Amino acid sequence: FTAREDDEILISISFEAPSGGYAYEKQKRKIGDYATAAAGVIIKVENNKCSSASIALTNLSDTPVYCDKAVDIIVGKEIDKNLLDQVTKACVDQSDPVADQRGPVEFKKYVAGIVIKKALNRAIERS
């Protein structure tokens, strides 16, 4: 919602740039093709604990999916393989892909798990 009137235009938006590591991973069949699954992650890690995170998926639902349940799982916790497995599962569980020419639902959920894990690990390395 905005309070902009019909005779007004938006000329700028200001917000604090996120800090930490970031990654965007996708799986596609060929160059120029739409991704079968994609994940974007921004994460801040301090003393091996996640202090903030944002995780989103594309091409795994009718609209992009913000993985709020996964963020709730990871923030404040020490990063380890078990935690990343839980976060990945929470993301996949929030996805709602449909079968199409890029594959059946089961395949898309499998691929989603791979791209989510890759994005998480890359973002953590960059944090």
Could you describe each region identified by the protein language model?
Residues F1-S127:
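C-terminal structural segment of proteins
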